[in-house]
């Protein structure tokens, strides 16, 4: 036997290298085979519900790192709630209708207009489901736990029927109407868009300054006067029917030198406009308030059949332009509102493809709207005063990335204005985890217009509306419920398979159809109505869920998307928000803080992270960032997270190895019998337990990460485990001192593994497989530990906080001695402490082997003044010299009792007593040489 064999060197097969990329899929299959999700649900049956409702990602393409961050966050919450006394089911969902899928099929060569619509929709459905299953596998690879066999998908018959019923209730309450308001119109998609389908980019446009000649000045202005107008959309002049001024803005009538014409502009802008137009020696002839100009009539710049009326509008400002805007009610929301209020014609001169129509005039007909500037300039002639290129923020179709226009077309709307206050009141009852989130959603609802819910596309849920022979729209409770029942059995494709009369209740009649003939609506619903109905399609319809949900968690862009549409439909139907809490996240940016883009080549695919690091590192990264704001991710950042993971893993490996001979049922030492330092570490660990439990409850992942890493690096690695080897390796295997420390080790190991499970389930299960005395076969089936408190806890914490200060001062003294070449390692030191009453009281309270805690071979405590050569730090003085004696071959301390024993071992008296007591046979035979 060799002397080293008398040491209790921890042994474990738990590998230092995690091998996550190859091991994770194996563990995930094991969990699936063991039906862990179902078993967890069974364990939680009867407990209070916590329902996190999954906002459905769009079923197209592989998941990106933003998806990963969002879904890992959801998984951490679901797992932590499931292990904290809640019944927390997770039903993943997917959004499957809409234009992107039609665009994919078009790229694949599918010609929609050349094939049967039902067959086309079948192709859309097949493609959408293929994407659902692909993304499902992507999410499962992240280590997510959920009901993967009972997903919710917006194209299933039960979901579509639930959506129709949401629409029906809104129709019954009078919230659905048809109108010809201007809407966001995407010529590139040939469809109306909702606000949530718009994104803003900078666009360079030609702006024109031109003049309308006064035709009837109402006794205020003469007919040789021109009102100066500014526009950034020259094509809309073809539909201009008025000029809008601000009622309280001051306007001036001016005449520049050399001009026979007189002009009206905003007084505040006269100086800048004079410079822009090249006016000199401008004479101000009169000043008017905007309201004085109301109902003056001007000529259209070139259309002699059209007069343009001066009207008042609150949207007019003097921030730019001339303080006067031309008004085309068919091409703008503000224009429409003031135009309708003043009886202006709603003219639309652009078709669905962005092409100018015949009513724009023969010079314009057939031109693309954005190419008509030269023609407009030609038509304006000497009425054009200036033109310039401006860069401004402009709405784009979020899918095609093309600019859109406002365009008045007949559409179906949900009248938000009819129940706006009810929605705002509902927002006040929701808990927002970021106050700005509440303000943002509140302001969006307060300021938004009615919701355009119709789309001129094919792949979606049909609007369940019929038309009588006289054109009357039919959407009664009876007809809508009948359609819902048909969809429930056959799916929405039946709408296209059957004639209108076969979709109506048997024997249905309507006074507007004396011949019994009916037509059906061909528009489909906005996809935001699809996902915005999920509270009904999922929460209400599934018995293991609750409505409203406890939590909606999505990216901050969903304040204008899913949070918004779900809120509107839920309040419209039931008067309540569909969620009790909202937690939003920022976007994942690259390492430089730039937006990720395939064109920039700075994207990071979750699959690439899984191959290089493992999903576990991605999960840990999610907790290492403040996801309420935009966050950064790169392979370098993930490498740093991987290093943190390595430290966590190796620390826990040390605990596994050094409890391998510990049977908790037999070897645990009661708290009251622990040493002071062990009590301290137990208390500190329970503080960590409370911090982490509270942070899980509040969804504060970064708090968990910081607290965990700090505990492992500072409390364990830099202190407790730093001197632990002198106990667990050196002392007798069954000695009280060793068992005391092992008791703490094992308690920390078991509980920290449970605490890590929601974040690092793969690693936690791997550790758990080495804990043979734990009864649950999977740690995921256990409960999170409860934080304990102990007698005299605060007193113990205060004592050890003071000792940590003392220890820090001692370490400074040792470092100075090391720099002076007095010692090398701290174990070579003889440390003398010149104590005062404070230090004396402290060390008595610590009641531990202080030399062991400081990792020095010899410690002397002297009462009285320190010599001049002593090193003083704050109010403690030290001297450091090399310890006397020889190095013990067993404990590596320098000890004056170290000597060669009769059994061929050069060891100190303390080690000799341990060896002689526990290894009598080896002592009798003598130890082998090293």
Swiss-Prot record:
UniProt-annotated binding residues for ATP: 598
A single MF term (Gene Ontology): aminoacyl-tRNA deacylase activity
Location relative to the cell: Cytoplasm
Residues annotated as binding L-isoleucyl-5'-AMP: 554
Co-factor note (free text): Binds 1 zinc ion per subunit.
Domain comment in the entry: IleRS has two distinct active sites: one for aminoacylation and one for editing. The misactivated valine is translocated from the active site to the editing site, which sterically excludes the correctly activated isoleucine. The single editing site contains two valyl binding pockets, one specific for each substrate (Val-AMP or Val-tRNA(Ile)).
Protein name listed in UniProt: Isoleucine--tRNA ligase
């Amino acid at each position: 036997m060799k002397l080293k064999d008398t040491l209790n060197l921890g042994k474990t097969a738990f590998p230092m290298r995690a091998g996550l990329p190859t091991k994770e899929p194996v563990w995930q299959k094991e969990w699936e085979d063991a039906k862990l999700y179902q078993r967890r649900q069974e364990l939680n049956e009867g407990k209070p519900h916590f329902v996190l409702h999954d906002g459905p990602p769009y079923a197209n393409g592989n998941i990106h790192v933003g998806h990963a961050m969002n879904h890992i966050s959801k998984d951490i919450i679901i797992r932590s709630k499931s292990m904290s006394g809640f019944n927390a089911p997770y039903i993943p969902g997917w959004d499957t209708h809409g234009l992107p899928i039609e665009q994919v099929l078009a790229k694949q060569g599918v010609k929609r207009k050349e094939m049967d619509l039902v067959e086309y929709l079948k192709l859309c459905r097949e493609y959408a489901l293929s994407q659902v299953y692909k993304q499902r596998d992507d999410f499962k690879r992240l280590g997510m736990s959920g009901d993967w066999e009972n997903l919710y998908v917006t194209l299933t018959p039960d979901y579509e029927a639930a959506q129709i019923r949401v629409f029906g209730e809104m129709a019954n309450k009078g919230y659905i109407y048809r109108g010809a308001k201007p809407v966001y119109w995407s010529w590139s998609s040939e469809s109306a868009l909702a606000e949530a389908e718009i994104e803003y980019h900078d666009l360079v446009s030609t702006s024109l300054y031109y003049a309308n000649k006064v035709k009837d000045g109402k006794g205020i202005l003469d007919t040789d006067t021109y009102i100066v107008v500014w526009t950034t959309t020259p094509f809309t002049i073809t539909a201009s029917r008025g000029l809008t001024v601000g009622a309280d803005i001051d306007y001036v009538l001016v005449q520049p030198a050399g001009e026979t014409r007189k002009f009206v502009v905003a007084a505040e802008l006269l100086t800048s406009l004079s410079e822009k137009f090249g006016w000199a020696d401008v004479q101000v002839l009169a000043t008017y308030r905007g309201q004085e100009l109301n109902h003056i009539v001007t000529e259209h710049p070139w259309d002699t059949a059209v007069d343009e009326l001066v009207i008042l509008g609150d949207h007019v400002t003097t921030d730019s332009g001339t303080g006067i805007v031309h008004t085309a009610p068919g091409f703008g929301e503000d224009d429409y509102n003031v135009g309708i209020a003043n009886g202006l014609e709603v003219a639309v001169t652009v078709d669905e493809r962005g092409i100018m129509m015949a009513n724009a005039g023969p010079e314009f007909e057939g031109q693309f709207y954005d190419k008509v500037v030269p023609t407009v300039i030609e038509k304006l002639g000497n009425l054009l005063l200036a033109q310039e290129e401006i860069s401004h923020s402009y709405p784009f179709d979020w899918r095609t990335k093309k600019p859109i226009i406002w365009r008045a077309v007949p559409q179906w709307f949900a009248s938000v204005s009819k129940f706006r206050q009810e929605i705002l009141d509902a927002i006040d009852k929701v808990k927002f985890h970021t106050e700005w989130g509440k303000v943002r959603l509140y302001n969006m609802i307060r300021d938004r217009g009615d919701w355009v819910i119709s789309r001129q596309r094919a792949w979606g849920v049909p609007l369940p509306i019929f038309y009588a022979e006289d054109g009357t729209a039919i959407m009664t409770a009876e007809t809508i419920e009948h359609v819902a029942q048909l969809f429930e059995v056959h799916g929405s494709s039946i709408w296209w398979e059957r004639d209108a009369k076969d979709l109506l209740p048997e024997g249905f009649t309507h006074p507007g159809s004396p011949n019994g003939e009916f037509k059906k609506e061909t528009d489909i619903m906005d996809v935001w109505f699809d996902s915005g109905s999920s509270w009904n399609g999922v929460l209400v319809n599934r018995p293991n869920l609750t409505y409203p949900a406890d939590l909606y968690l999505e990216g901050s862009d969903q304040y204008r998307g899913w949070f918004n549409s779900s809120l509107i439909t839920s309040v419209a139907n039931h008067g309540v928000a569909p969620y009790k809490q909202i937690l939003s996240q920022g976007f994942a940016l690259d390492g430089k803080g730039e937006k990720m883009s395939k064109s920039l080549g700075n994207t990071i695919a979750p699959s690439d992270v899984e191959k290089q690091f493992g999903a576990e590192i991605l999960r840990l990264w999610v907790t290492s960032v403040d996801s309420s704001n935009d966050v950064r991710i790169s392979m370098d950042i993930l490498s740093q997270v991987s290093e943190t993971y390595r430290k966590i893993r190796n620390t826990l490996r040390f605990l596994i190895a050094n409890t391998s001979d510990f049977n908790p049922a037999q070897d645990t030492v009661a708290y009251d019998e622990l040493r002071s330092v062990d009590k301290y570490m137990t208390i500190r660990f329970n503080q960590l337990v409370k911090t982490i439990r509270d942070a899980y409850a509040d969804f504060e992942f970064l708090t968990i990460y910081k607290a965990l890493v700090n505990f492992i690096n500072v409390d364990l690695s830099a202190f407790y485990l730093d001197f632990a080897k002198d106990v667990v390796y050196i002392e007798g295997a069954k000695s009280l001192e060793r068992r005391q420390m092992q008791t703490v080790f094992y308690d920390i190991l078991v509980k920290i593994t449970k605490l890590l499970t929601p974040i690092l389930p793969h690693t936690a299960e791997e550790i758990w497989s080495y804990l043979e005395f734990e009864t649950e076969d999977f740690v995921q089936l256990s409960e999170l530990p409860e934080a304990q408190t102990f007698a005299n806890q605060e007193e113990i914490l205060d004592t050890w906080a003071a000792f940590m200060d003392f220890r820090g001062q001692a370490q400074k003294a040792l470092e100075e001695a090391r720099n002076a070449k007095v010692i090398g390692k701290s174990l070579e030191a003889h440390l003398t402490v010149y104590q005062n009453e404070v230090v004396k009281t402290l060390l008595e309270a610590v009641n531990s082997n202080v030399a062991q805690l400081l990792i020095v071979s010899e410690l002397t405590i002297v009462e009285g003044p320190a010599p001049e050569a002593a090193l003083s730090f704050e109010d403690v003085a030290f001297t450091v010299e090399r310890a006397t004696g020889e190095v013990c071959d067993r404990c590596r301390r320098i000890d004056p009792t170290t000597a060669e024993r009769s059994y061929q071992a050069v060891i100190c008296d303390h080690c000799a007593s341990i060896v002689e007591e526990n290894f009598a046979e080896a002592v009798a035979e003598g130890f082998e040489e090293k």
